[in-house]
């Protein structure tokens, strides 16, 4: 069987792990089964463990343990998409304990992403401020906007709306 080293704590990195998890979720969605669901849930649980910063609840970063680099919107959005995929599968499987855990973490993550979003009147440092409204800054303390962060962030918000509409979130 294929092994996913990302589920091993020694090999876990929050920049790479979501891609493994999303591949497992896609495999499950395609085949309605996957022999790697334990790995998916382990990765999701490890991501949730990173949401421990009292100053930025919902952000996927902790200064305890290994240095995974500075937090950023791309990692936060991909981690949130991973939790959403895990919630969908946990719901399909009737795993209420995981559903509750993932819902709580997703709401925290959504609050974090929303806090990164530019509102009208907050974007005066840009040449065309109105074009930045709605975009997500790369980091809380950084005015930079990166396309991948905006695109993955938009996907998170769209996915959240679908989960809410379907009564899953």
Model-derived regions: residue spans:
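Glycan-recognition and catalytic cores of secretory/periplasmic carbohydrate-active enzymes
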Residues: 1-169
């Amino acid at each position: 069987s294929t092994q996913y080293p990302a589920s091993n704590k020694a090999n876990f990195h929050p920049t790479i792990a979501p891609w493994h998890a999303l591949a497992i979720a896609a495999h499950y969605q395609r085949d309605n089964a996957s022999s790697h669901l334990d790995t998916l849930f382990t990765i999701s649980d490890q991501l949730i463990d990173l949401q421990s910063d009292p100053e930025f609840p919902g952000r996927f970063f902790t200064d305890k343990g290994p240095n995974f680099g500075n937090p950023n919107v791309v990692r936060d959005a991909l981690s949130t998409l991973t939790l959403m995929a895990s919630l969908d599968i946990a719901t399909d499987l009737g795993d209420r304990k995981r559903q509750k855990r993932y819902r709580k973490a997703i709401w925290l993550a959504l609050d974090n992403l929303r806090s990164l979003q530019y509102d009208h009147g907050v974007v005066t440092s840009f040449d065309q401020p109105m074009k930045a409204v709605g975009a997500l800054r790369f980091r809380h303390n950084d005015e930079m906007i990166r396309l991948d962060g905006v695109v993955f962030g938009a996907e998170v918000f769209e996915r959240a709306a679908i989960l809410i509409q379907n009564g899953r979130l």
